[in-house]
């Protein structure tokens, strides 16, 4: 099953996403900011990263700059945000993100469909597609 890295500072959402995806059989590591994500990536090689944009310590955009997705083309990144069509979302696309998921439109229980779609295993409604 696919490996997923969750990078979300809201502990309730982080925990809910982790439980849901683990229950579906995914190998999941979850962290709370971009710096923790960079640290986790030293030992965990995900197929998909679910990335919040606005976080303390290191936000999603800075993480994307540091991670250099062009060197990790096999990894897909979905941005979690509440900012549809914002400059930050556009910048995330420029840095290699594949899609933006509006948090308020994607209930935690629908996360599996979104992930399956991103990994090529299904179809789900999202706000953007690179």
Where are the predicted features?
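Conserved acidic carboxylate
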Residues: 8
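Receiver (REC) domain active-site loop signature in two-component systems and cognate sites
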Residues: 55
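Short amphipathic alpha-helix used as the core "switch/output" element in two-component signaling
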Residues: 39, 61-73
């Amino acid at each position: 099953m696919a490996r997923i890295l969750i990078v979300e500072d809201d502990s309730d959402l982080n925990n809910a996403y982790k439980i849901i995806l683990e229950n579906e059989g995914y190998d999941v590591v979850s962290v709370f900011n971009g710096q923790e994500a960079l640290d986790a990536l030293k030992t965990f090689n995900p197929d998909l990263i679910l990335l919040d944009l606005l976080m303390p310590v290191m936000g999603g955009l800075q993480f994307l700059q540091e991670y250099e997705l062009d060197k990790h083309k096999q990894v897909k990144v979905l941005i979690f945000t509440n900012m549809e069509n914002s400059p930050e979302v556009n910048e995330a696309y420029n840095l290699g993100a594949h899609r933006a998921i509006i948090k308020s439109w994607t209930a935690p229980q629908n996360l599996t469909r979104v992930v399956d779609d991103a990994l090529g295993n299904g179809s789900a409604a999202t706000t953007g597609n690179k």
